[in-house]
């Protein structure tokens, strides 16, 4: 928290400075009380602390700009000693001589246990340094602490203003750190009040999410479906469905080439010149709102969409290629259906602004009734009756790779050269496959989710691009507790034809030195990325080399966690870790330069992230793998693997065929089974 500390020429100000810095994680900015108040950049601060000092608050030379800071800053304020007396004086109280001067003496203070005193014992010992005392309070101020009948603490009844007569920073005061931490939390909570309110309705029903999506959103504006088609304990439990038809919805698209965010809303279209991560961070800060009680997930509305791989240029990498689709696209969702696959319940969330609740409440009523009447979940997902890959005749007729077999092997050998010469430890080399077919994106996605259920699936139907994602990999999640978690995947085996073969493949993956080396390098890379923004000592690895099994493959997965430092936002954490290390290799920046040179083109959505940024401060993003991208120019997907010194070039190429199975099977099956003229994305847009 960024704090303005006004120094009233006191000898204890920098003791207060140190304690505030320890509590807030960032040092306060100190100004003397005789500076020009109008020159203070108040918009750069989250709170004001007014220090102790000599003299009287009614004397301008003694109190100076402290008075205007209390009355005009609009920020949360804590006054200490003279600062406390100033608050009492400015709001109409009287400050006179105390019954006796008290300096450097310890007294017990009793309190009501509210606000800055929350969670503190009553009484506790504090140090007093004062000859004056507030002996009467105005109606606007409420006494909340006393000693020997004298007021030791106040709060304003309607403004975020508090005062304490004693010195919490003194070496002999108890619970000074905790009192300042309470002020920090009060200030942050006040600043988070954005005028937005989240309304909730719970429906005791588990609808079929595909049927519900088709009924409510398939033909809507900017529909989205974050799809936990495979429910795994501790990983996936909720699916989120919605579109951009709400009154507060906004659609953001970003192009690195121009550095502009285009914002489309009900009031029109505007452009903002800003890096995307900075714009997103500022909007989330302005719109922050807590999650209502009883909601069992952290996504309380906010931004849903994708971050494309080329957005790496905002994380320190070079901008080399320009993708066909936007480099980032996010919908500000003000309406949402959340399906709880574990509890068998559904939650509806709607956002209102400045007390205009009628539209939100009406939507909850109408949509809740439709959810209650929707078909129930039928458990349709499961294994495909057949798997196709890049060697299948049906696929070979319509597929074209950016790099053919020989070209891909040549690039793998170049990776070996870079590794041998110390330029990289691991290069996550990928290929792009284009499919000359015509699909209906939603039909293809629903088939993909049936044959390859995953915890982090997604369907996005945005202007100019549809994204059909069957990702098993989490990039990064951040809870409201500010704990960040990454789950990189490195190491893949196909499923076996028999239980015995399947178990053998799983065991081989778990014990293979090459796969463990791949995984370990990315674990260490992500530990580094999280350490950039995390508390000292908080980054740890609760799971190393864990095998997770999905319909087409076994995967080797590790888990890394860290707790963000107070001054680091969730968006800053995402930016520090983006793109996910499992899609780059290490060292990250040098390896991305190698990737740009070898791959000869943009990755686009592939290798980026899909998910949400909540108004609660929470985040959940996947890694974009096993994903089809449909644009006006056709259908494509990326596929690749990590190249290390232990890699075998032919085996790496063969692994890309395994990883492509779900995508090509979904495309070929739906293209062949179309009952009418199939359509490209362009056809669908023209029809709309």
Across the structure, where does each feature detected by a protein language model lie?
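Short loop/turn elements that flank and shape the SAM/SAH-binding pocket of Class I
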Residues: 36-39, 134-135, 331
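Charged helix-capping and loop-helix junction motifs
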Residues: 61-68, 145, 178-180, 443, ...
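Extended alpha-helical targeting/anchoring segments
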Residues: 193-688
């Amino acid at each position: 928290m960024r704090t303005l500390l006004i120094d009233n020429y006191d000898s204890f100000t920098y003791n207060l400075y140190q304690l505030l810095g320890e509590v807030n994680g960032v040092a306060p900015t100190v100004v003397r009380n005789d500076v020009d108040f109008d020159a203070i950049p108040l918009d750069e601060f989250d709170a004001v602390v007014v220090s102790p000092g000599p003299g009287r608050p009614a004397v301008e030379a003694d109190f100076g700009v402290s008075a205007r800071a209390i009355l005009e800053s609009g920020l949360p304020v804590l006054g200490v000693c003279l600062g406390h007396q100033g608050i009492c004086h400015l709001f109409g109280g009287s400050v006179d001589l105390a019954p006796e001067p008290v300096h450097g003496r310890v007294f017990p203070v009793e309190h009501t246990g509210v606000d800055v005193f929350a969670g503190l014992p009553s009484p506790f010992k504090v140090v007093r340094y004062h000859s004056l005392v507030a002996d009467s309070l105005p109606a606007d101020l409420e006494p909340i602490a006393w000693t020997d009948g004298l007021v030791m603490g106040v709060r304003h009844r309607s403004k975020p203003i508090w005062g304490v007569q004693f010195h919490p920073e003194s070496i002999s005061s108890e619970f000074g750190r905790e009192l300042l931490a309470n002020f920090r939390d009060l200030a942050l909570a006040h600043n988070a009040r954005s005028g937005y309110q989240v309304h909730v309705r719970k429906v005791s029903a588990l609808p079929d999410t595909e049927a519900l999506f088709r009924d409510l959103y398939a033909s809507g504006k900017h529909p989205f479906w974050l799809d936990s088609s495979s429910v795994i304990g501790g990983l996936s439990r909720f699916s989120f469905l919605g579109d951009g038809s709400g009154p507060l919805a906004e659609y953001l698209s970003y192009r690195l080439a121009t550095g502009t965010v285009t914002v489309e809303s009900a009031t029109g279209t505007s452009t903002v010149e800003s890096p995307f991560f900075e714009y997103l961070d500022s909007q989330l800060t302005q719109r922050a709102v807590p999650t209502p009680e009883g909601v069992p997930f952290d996504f309380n509305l906010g931004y849903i969409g994708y971050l494309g791989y080329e957005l790496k240029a905002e994380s320190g990498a070079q901008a080399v290629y320009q993708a066909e689709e936007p480099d980032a696209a996010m919908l500000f969702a003000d309406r949402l259906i959340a399906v709880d696959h574990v509890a068998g319940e559904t939650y509806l969330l709607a956002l209102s602004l400045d007390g205009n609740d009628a539209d939100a409440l009406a939507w909850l009523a109408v949509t809740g009734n439709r959810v209650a009447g929707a078909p129930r979940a039928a458990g349709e997902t499961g294994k495909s009756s057949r798997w196709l890959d890049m060697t299948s005749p049906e696929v070979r007729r319509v597929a074209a790779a950016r790099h053919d077999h020989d070209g891909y092997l040549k690039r793998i050998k170049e990776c070996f050269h870079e590794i041998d010469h110390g330029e990289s430890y691991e290069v996550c080399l990928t290929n792009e496959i284009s499919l000359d077919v015509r699909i209906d994106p939603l039909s293809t996605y629903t088939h993909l989710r049936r044959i390859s259920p995953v915890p982090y699936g997604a369907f996005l139907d945005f202007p100019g691009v549809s994204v059909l994602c069957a990702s098993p990999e989490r990039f990064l999640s951040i809870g409201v507790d500010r704990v960040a978690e990454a789950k990189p995947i490195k190491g893949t085996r196909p499923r076996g034809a028999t239980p015995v073969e399947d178990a053998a493949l799983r065991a081989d993956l778990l014990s293979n030195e090459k796969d463990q080396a791949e995984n370990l390098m990315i674990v260490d890379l992500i530990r580094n990325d999280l350490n950039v923004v995390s508390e000292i000592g908080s980054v740890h690895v609760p799971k190393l080399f864990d095998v997770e099994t999905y319909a087409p493959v076994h995967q080797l997965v590790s888990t890394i966690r860290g707790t963000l430092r107070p001054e680091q936002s969730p968006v800053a954490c995402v930016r520090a870790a983006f793109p996910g290390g499992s899609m780059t290799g290490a060292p990250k920046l040098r390896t991305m330069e190698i990737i740009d040179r070898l791959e000869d083109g943009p990755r686009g959505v592939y290798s980026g992230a899909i998910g949400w940024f909540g108004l609660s401060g929470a985040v959940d993003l996947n890694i974009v793998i096993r994903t089809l991208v449909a644009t006006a120019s056709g259908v494509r997907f990326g596929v690749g693997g990590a190249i290390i010194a232990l890699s075998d070039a032919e085996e790496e190429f063969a692994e890309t065929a395994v990883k492509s199975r779900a995508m090509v099977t979904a495309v070929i099956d739906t293209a062949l089974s179309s009952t009418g003229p199939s359509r490209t994305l362009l056809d669908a847009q023209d029809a709309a």
